[in-house]
């Protein structure tokens, strides 16, 4: 074992603190302070140091989030305080009945109120003790003359919080360090899943406070964002595994995985909502209301849902509920209702619990998002990649405010699992509250003569045999001349994020394919005025505009062209990454998968798809024809001599990061001297001089980015905005024109709403960028 020096010990501690702060800023505050690549490099360095010097490993190190060995089983543990579920209310009248009950209970108690309203719960010092824990408030003085029947109960504050659709967790901290994470279980006994809990980046391994309390317990909800959930299901579907029914089931199943490495890959998130302290910590943290409790949780380093609101009346509660019933579809996670609590923790304590529920809280559920209907038939769709998707044709039904007539059945495996028959009664829901899908079949209601639906063996569009590739759940048509694949490819090529051909919509694409004028994307650039005007409802003016739009599309940058080619798994971000590494189509088309996967962010599977696509003769012919037509197939070379020197300097910096402390200092001194000499210390964005924006929607506008975007990193979005003439700032102010909102928008979004700043999704931003030509 290498000798541990004070210098190495101090350096390791500093490295650990930097990573902890960067993780907190990214996962909890949603305000990144460190580039992903830098974080990954520093984490790897910390792992190497801890491997070399095991005595430096501490329980709250970022390296300890994922365990090395899978667990063999989970141990049952008793909760320090029972983890009760909530009573449900399904409409406002039931909420009012709950209010009447707690008010009546309060009057019946006729006890003296303890003021000030203090929230303290006694917890015994050892989490292994099995005694019952009781809520007490022995430290606050009793004020005479202040009993329940003298209080204006109608003026008591409520606090409303979104009910996150996930799995409840109880987290125990001793001396500020996370020592246990447990599931709800039956409310009295749960399972110790500490190893899995540590993989959730929004759960602090160490409380962010000096001199922490001896014992702290935090309750909250572990959940999967909609985007992460959909990605997990897509991966499971691809390898032939059964997909999860909903994010809640996926979160629960993930938490009970014996291998924490699997848990880490699924990117669970966590919102904290309750804090319990030991009685003798009275001088440490003072809080008297649930709203103060939430603020304190944030100070301790926890992520708290930003949409909570204190309401002074049931009318305000109703308004809050109605607002989020309409707005929840815009959230990046699922919420199935609103949790309404009495804000006063002392009043909560006085009211106590029934055998099942707290008397001081209730879950006001949204209208049902699942509803039964009848399958009248099944049709099969063919996507642009040849994927065959069965779709249930339903008896029209109202669901989440819209009429649903069709629902996805995903693939043949899912269809077989459901054992679907025409005429079956099925339960339908909005997947991610957006796309309708069939959740389950009710076979007990099946008509006697109902026929099981059989997946076709031949493509419904071109009649060619269908195949199901190994290790995939999706059945495909592989006929490159299939009309459905061609229609999808043309629509994708013309989309705003690709070549942005204005006027080439779905109906016109259908006409071009049906008429035989277009049999390949390349045929678009051979269309004449005579060809177009021969189509129904296509006059000379419209035809001329379309020809102009197609001419303009030839100048779109190489990254857009690559995206437009429709290679599987090559979205806008991957296209950007690939074209930076391979600035010409010749370089990319000749690259092997092993070369392609060296691009940061491109895995071996995507690399294989890219290599295979360019090996298909029909695709090679398409690329050649597009080049002949004048479509851009390379990135303009913006690499000056100084920029090339910059690459050398960056290589030196990377080398420095791998050296010992003394050698690193020498190399860093060299880098500093090069800076003074005027050498640029950052890579020039290869897209910056592709288009000089003279005017447009974004020019001169101020943007703020918040949350995790679906397909882009925030630095990529920032570069695109700046290239279009916009300005990106880190904080929201009255001068902010737009806020681009990703998953878990946080406090920036909240402030933007108050200031009336216009919100943009990633797709809306890309549309605006497409208009500018970026």
From Swiss-Prot:
Q: Report the GO molecular function annotations.
A: DNA binding; DNA ligase (NAD+) activity; metal ion binding
Give the annotated active site. Answer: 163 (n6-amp-lysine intermediate)
- Domain BRCT, chain residue ranges per copy: 693-774
Q: Has UniProt tagged this entry with the keyword Calcium?
A: no
Q: Recorded E.C. number(s)?
A: 6.5.1.2
Q: Name one Pfam family in it.
A: BRCT
Enzyme class, spelled out:
ligase
Q: Which GO terms describe its biological process?
A: DNA repair; DNA replication
Q: Specify which residues bind NAD(+) according to the UniProt entry for this protein.
A: 36-40, 85-86, 161, 184, 221, 341, 365
Swiss-Prot/TrEMBL cofactor(s): Mg(2+); Mn(2+)
The alphabetized UniProt keywords are: DNA damage, DNA repair, DNA replication, Ligase, Magnesium, Manganese, Metal-binding, NAD, Zinc
Q: Which residues bind Zn(2+)?
A: 459, 462, 477, 482
Question: InterPro entries from the entry?
Answer: BRCT_dom (IPR001357), BRCT_dom_sf (IPR036420), DisA/LigA_HHH (IPR041663), DNA_ligase (IPR001679), DNA_ligase_AS (IPR018239), DNA_ligase_CS (IPR033136), DNAligase_adenylation (IPR013839), DNAligase_N (IPR013840)
Highest taxon of the source?
A: Bacteria
Q: Which reaction does it catalyse?
A: NAD(+) + (deoxyribonucleotide)n-3'-hydroxyl + 5'-phospho-(deoxyribonucleotide)m = (deoxyribonucleotide)n+m + AMP + beta-nicotinamide D-nucleotide
Q: Keyword Manganese: yes or no? A: yes
Q: Could you tell me what this protein does?
A: DNA ligase that catalyzes the formation of phosphodiester linkages between 5'-phosphoryl and 3'-hydroxyl groups in double-stranded DNA using NAD as a coenzyme and as the energy source for the reaction. It is essential for DNA replication and repair of damaged DNA.
Q: Which NCBIfam families does the record cross-reference, listed alphabetically?
A: dnlj (TIGR00575), PRK07956.1 (NF005932)
Q: Which family does it belong to?
A: Belongs to the NAD-dependent DNA ligase family. LigA subfamily.
Do you know which PANTHER family this protein is assigned to? Answer: CHROMOSOME TRANSMISSION FIDELITY FACTOR 18, REPLICATION FACTOR C SUBUNIT 1
Which protein, by its recorded name, is this? DNA ligase
Q: Which organism is it from?
A: Trichodesmium erythraeum (strain IMS101)
Name the gene behind this protein. Answer: ligA
